[in-house]
Amino acid sequence: MARIAGVDLPRDKRVEIALTYLYGIGLSRSHEILDATGVSPDVRVKDLSDEDALKLRTYIDENYEIEGDLRRWEAMNIKRLGDIGTYRGRRHRQGLPVRGQRTRTNARTRRGRRLTVAGKKKTPAKK
């Protein structure tokens, strides 16, 4: 089983797809890596030779920030925005959309589930 940056790649998938299971590597970057290392994108992970797996592992470790390092870098950037008091940092802290989207309607992903506010109860009419 190929293990890169602490992540087990799925054995039955093609290498070009399996590399996208690493945080920070998408399909286009996967193609770049395979072209640079000379590994065929059509080979399955279970059929990958130890030599090819080692080539992939060393190339990725030397040239890309992935997984924990990338997550830590992103978290530090967001924290930095909050520390210097920017509008974007404040929006991150409040859990609201950061890039100017409207929030009166929509923005459900960032704001969470709807909380219904109980309406004023009607009192029975007096006779």
Curated annotation (Swiss-Prot):
Annotated InterPro entries: Rbsml_uS13_C (IPR027437), Ribosomal_uS13 (IPR001892), Ribosomal_uS13-like_H2TH (IPR010979), Ribosomal_uS13_bac-type (IPR019980), Ribosomal_uS13_CS (IPR018269)
Naturally occurring in which organism (per UniProt): Synechocystis sp. (strain ATCC 27184 / PCC 6803 / Kazusa)
Residue ranges, annotated region (Disordered): 90-127
GO cellular component, one term: cytosol
Signal peptide span: none
UniProt cross-references to HAMAP family, sorted A to Z: Ribosomal_uS13
Stretches with biased composition (Basic residues): 101-127
Gene3D superfamilies in the cross-refs: 1.10.8.50, 30s ribosomal protein s13, domain 2 (4.10.910.10)
GO MF annotations in UniProt: rRNA binding; structural constituent of ribosome; tRNA binding
The keyword RNA-binding appears for this protein: yes
Alphabetized UniProt keyword annotations: Ribonucleoprotein, Ribosomal protein, RNA-binding, rRNA-binding, tRNA-binding
A biological process term (GO) from this entry: translation
Entry keyword annotation includes Mitochondrion: no
Subunit (UniProt): Part of the 30S ribosomal subunit. Forms a loose heterodimer with protein S19. Forms two bridges to the 50S subunit in the 70S ribosome.
Function description: Located at the top of the head of the 30S subunit, it contacts several helices of the 16S rRNA. In the 70S ribosome it contacts the 23S rRNA (bridge B1a) and protein L5 of the 50S subunit (bridge B1b), connecting the 2 subunits; these bridges are implicated in subunit movement. Contacts the tRNAs in the A and P-sites.
Protein name per its UniProtKB record: Small ribosomal subunit protein uS13
Family: Belongs to the universal ribosomal protein uS13 family.
